[in-house]
Regions:
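Fungal secretory targeting signals
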Residues: 1-24, 29
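Extended effector regions of multi-domain proteins
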Residues: 21-217, 224-225, 236-491, 501-510, ...
Length: 792
């Protein structure tokens, strides 16, 4: 049995030479043509629609998307030519070699970008951001470099350390798990030494043998105590069927390892835990096992972990459910080369990145910029438990890769069958990976009107059509659905939904940390906190943060005959500086916040802006205060909303490798706050989505997206002269007389399709699922592309 089957708990990553994938390897890789990597449906023009994609041309280059294939090759070769770096090709490397971890575009400075986007300057010079890991020493470390300008030119291109975007002052992070394979081997050695006990307690073994039925997974992040490095590990039952359910099959048997240094002969087991009891040594554990009065046994796989249909079928469920169609074809345009999209009067660019996945840029309405940048920064899952492994677990998911975890979307299920699909590409370990059809674009009818009103003589209603950009990232046991939606009224929502297997803990009779949800399974409590950056530019870069608050008052009015009237009023104030901008949502939702421009009042004297507020589901910040596991690595998680003055030296609230040294992170969000003014400055918002998740029986086998959802909306506030949704023709007004007979019907030019619709167009295409396409970059082999299963 493979040690690291589908369990994100395992800290071993590609940095240590072992990649913990949420899937077993697929079949042997086969040659693949990129020609069919992106799904573009086209049908005959008979019937309602040709479904032909609307191709458009972006007004400018997409200066935000990652490196081109040629740039990846050039930068890789350039770095290998720098003898002082002493790099080894990844395909030939060991855990003691220096390697290239990843390459991406170093995002342009905002001033340079806006100068180009507004037509006043040249395209910003392109620079690569190179993440290198130096393993050829006793203390391995990651160092970020900047390489450029691109393309590579002899005598012009240079490389240097990338330090200015890190609050620590340097882009260097110590790595304590570089010897991932050695750690895995050590843990299997421990499993072998106590296999007599695991057979007795768990009826299984984890020794590295083919007939193992247990596996071992470790806590993340590693535990730093003084100058020592520790990790808790737990034995899990291996799945016995088709479903990778290990994270709900804990055994409670855990051991703590001191893995300080790089010499495995000096590593040692320094503690054992089982079913609420602790022993400081293996000898004490062996002795204590003999006197155990309770031996509950492990959680075992079975039909309860299956996600297939089971149980009695629902009434009338044999009938095909409603579906959405686009009878006249897509109503949005796409420039695939530039990843540029237009829908109604919205336009924007998208980019995709290994750590953070989908990002939106230069979002405009009728050509006027609303948002410079909008995208995920980090996703945290922080656990709590009476057992040491879960008490030590706080996952920062960009370290695993939100972008690397975006896979082919399931047509008709992840997205409507009429959706348009885009590919994503990223670079890791000297190979580019193409994930076909991993972003989808589509319109849908929300099923309720965006506007409606009825009177004694008429009723009016307007369709609520929404345009959505969606991706799904499977990070270990959890699947995150990320989507950005655009609305007729000029508002934008970002939504995160979660599904997949929970990470359960062993039930030892204590309900303080979760419900008892299966035989020996506790629904281990945890917080999901998902951080986003939102850089609004309201009629320019100079903005302020307005707070409006409903407050109860008792007031005497000229008309109240001297009596106090108990009522309420609105208080307006501005958040004047960064130190006052760490915001927790007000009780009862009485306070609201908006980015406004005080220098460009509308004709009524009000400051135009966009306000931000929770939309659906729950929002959350971290419950734990001064987390022992996180140290200073996730200070962005402590409140709901933040406002900061923009600086090119502070491009992100988080860093993908903060979890390697959480008490000394390269990016400490708390250091962004230094009292700077927020009065008519270039303001950047950071906000958190998420939920406090206390899993119950409804989370088995998988959590469902109906309850695991969090959403934020930004909407115009005194920005436009009225409701923008009045511009759509897809509305109706019915006038009726005193006898309630309709005398007039206004449909404002809407033409109802009357053609026959071919239902085959709406049938999900489930035969084209592609895992990923890998293209080696060093040595460069453009004809050596391979198609593999996800994680294969």
């Amino acid at each position: 049995m493979l040690l690291m089957v589908c369990v994100r708990l395992c800290l071993l990553s590609f940095l240590g030479g072992v990649l913990a994938h949420p899937f077993v390897p697929g079949p042997a890789a086969r040659p693949h043509s990129l020609d069919r990597a992106s799904k573009k449906r086209e049908y005959s023009t008979t019937g309602c629609s040709s479904e032909k994609e609307v191709a458009i041309t972006a007004p400018t280059k997409n200066i935000f998307q990652s490196l081109t294939d040629r740039e990846y090759v050039q930068v890789t070769e350039f770095l290998h030519q720098q003898k002082e770096l002493n790099l080894t090709a990844v395909v030939n490397s060991t855990s003691w070699d220096n390697v290239i971890v990843t390459l991406d575009l170093l995002q342009p400075n905002k001033t340079d970008a806006l100068t180009y986007l507004e037509g006043y300057g040249p395209v910003p010079a392109r620079y690569a951001r190179a993440t290198l890991q130096f393993n050829s020493q006793l203390q391995p470390y990651i160092q970020e470099y900047v390489v450029g300008p691109l393309p590579i030119k002899n005598g012009l291109t240079r490389y240097e350390e990338l330090n200015y975007i890190f609050t620590s002052g340097h882009g260097r992070t110590k790595v304590y798990n570089a010897d991932g394979e050695a750690i895995a081997t050590f843990n299997l050695k421990v499993g072998t030494e106590i296999k007599d006990i695991t057979k007795r307690l768990l009826n299984g073994t984890a020794t590295g043998a083919d007939d193992d039925n247990l596996l071992i997974a470790g806590s993340d992040p590693l535990i730093h105590s003084g100058d020592r490095i520790y990790q808790w590990n737990e034995f899990y039952s291996a799945h016995s069927g088709e479903f990778f359910s290990e994270t709900i099959l804990p055994s409670s048997l855990q051991f703590k390892v001191d893995i300080t240094g790089r010499d495995p002969s000096k590593w040692e087991v320094v503690g054992w835990y089982y079913d609420g009891q602790y022993w400081p040594t293996t000898a004490a554990f062996r002795k204590g096992v003999k006197t155990l009065t309770r031996r509950p046994g492990p959680n075992l796989d079975g039909s309860w972990t299956s996600t297939d249909q089971q149980g009695g079928k629902l009434p009338r469920d044999q009938l095909y459910p409603p579906i959405s169609v686009q009878p006249d074809g897509p109503r949005f345009g796409v420039d695939r080369e530039q990843n540029y999209i237009e829908w109604m009067d919205f336009s924007f660019f998208i980019s995709n990145h290994k750590e953070t996945g989908l990002q939106l840029h230069d979002i405009r309405y009728k050509g006027e910029r609303l948002i410079y940048e909008f995208g995920l920064q980090e996703a945290l899952a922080h656990y709590a438990s009476q057992d040491p492994l879960h008490a030590s677990s706080a996952y920062l998911d960009t370290s695993y890769g939100i972008g690397t975890s975006q896979w082919n979307l399931v047509d008709g299920f992840d997205c409507p069958s009429h959706a348009t699909y885009l590919n994503t590409t990223f670079y890791i370990s000297e190979t580019t990976h193409v994930h076909p059809n991993s972003i989808c674009l589509f319109e849908y009818d929300a099923g309720y009107p965006i506007q409606r009103h009825l009177t004694s003589t008429y009723v009016s209603a307007t369709k609520n059509i929404v345009f959505t950009v969606r991706s799904v990232s499977t990070v270990g046991n959890y699947d995150y659905l990320f989507e950005y939606s655009f609305h007729y009224d000029g508002s934008i929502t970002v939504t995160v939904r979660a599904s997949g297997y929970i990470q359960g803990a062993f039930w030892s009779g204590d309900g303080d940390y979760g419900f008892h949800i299966h035989d020996n399974l506790s629904g281990s409590m945890h917080d999901h906190v998902i951080n986003f950056k939102l850089d609004l530019d309201i009629k320019g870069r100079k903005n302020s943060l307005l707070k409006t608050e409903f407050v109860p008052i008792s007031q005497v009015y000229p008309w109240s005959d001297g009596q106090s009237i108990n009522t309420m009023k609105v208080n307006r104030s501005y958040i004047s500086n960064e130190d006052d901008s760490k915001i927790t949502w007000a009780k009862n939702g009485v306070a609201a916040y908006a980015v406004v421009n005080k220098d460009k009042l509308n004709k009524f004297g009000e400051a135009p802006g966009y306000h931000i507020f929770p939309n659906s589901g729950s929002t959350a910040h971290l419950t734990v205060q001064s987390s022992s596991a996180l140290g200073q690595s996730a200070n962005w998680a402590n409140h709901n909303l933040y406002a900061l003055q923009h600086h090119d030296t502070e491009p992100k609230s988080a860093y993908a490798f903060n979890s390697h040294d959480p008490h000394h992170p390269a990016v400490d969000f708390a250091k962004f706050f230094n009292g700077e003014s927020l009065d008519q400055e270039d303001i950047v918002l950071y906000f958190n989505l998420g939920m406090h998740h206390l899993p119950n029986t409804a989370d088995l086998p998988n959590t469902v997206t109906t309850t695991a959802v969090s959403s934020m909306m930004i909407a115009p506030q005194n920005y436009f002269p009225g409701d923008l949704s009045r511009r759509t023709i897809h509305q109706a007004r019915l006038t009726y007389n005193e006898k309630s007979i309709v005398t007039d019907k206004k449909t404002f030019g809407t033409k109802q399709p009357t053609c026959a619709y071919d239902m085959n167009k709406s049938a999900p295409d489930l035969s084209t699922f592609v895992g990923e396409i890998e293209i080696p970059k060093f040595p460069w082999n453009p004809s050596g592309s391979l198609q593999t299963n996800p994680g294969g």
